[in-house]
Amino acid sequence: KNPAGTNWYHSHTHELTGAQVYQGLAGMIIISDDVEQKLELPSGEYDLPIIIQDRNFTHDNQLSFNLRRHDRMRGFLGNSILVNGQVNSLIPVKTRAYRLRILNGSNARIYKLGWNDGTAITAIGTDGGLLEKPQNLPYVMLAPAERVELWVDFSGRKPGSELILQSLTYQGTHSTMGRGMMGNGSMR
């Protein structure tokens, strides 16, 4: 039996994985178990799956997957950031606690996720399942295919206010990473 966690499925067709995932052959699988259910984490409509992906759109708003040599070696970076398939996504929430299950479904882009007002990120799970205890962090780094689970409590927020989970700029680890690897989309 698999332990609770946020997982994802995607194509593994030889030499076609990137293109098939890009065209939508991927998604999230959420596994629950008795241990997780005893924790009484936010569930149902308060447990939100969030998939972040970058995509290239042509001038007439069509998806483009034309890989150059460099893209085939290191992955490509899209010109738009999508959240659950939408550009400039807005997720309305109630003034209560939520569980956010976030998957980086991008081909090569790394995200440094943080709240726009500097509020600490509370991580409760990763690819390996739930953490032993929550971790309060200034931000989380999310590489392609990585997942993170966040706990966020909006109960102290005024109705109608915004808290934006955004991709913060950062310096990459080698010379080509800093150029274009910084997502500038946001989740609202």
Go through the PLM ranges and name each one.
Residues 31-33, 52-56, 117, 154-156:
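Non-catalytic surface loops within mature trypsin-like serine protease
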Residues 64-188:
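Histidine- and aromatic-rich segments of cupredoxin/plastocyanin-like copper-binding domains
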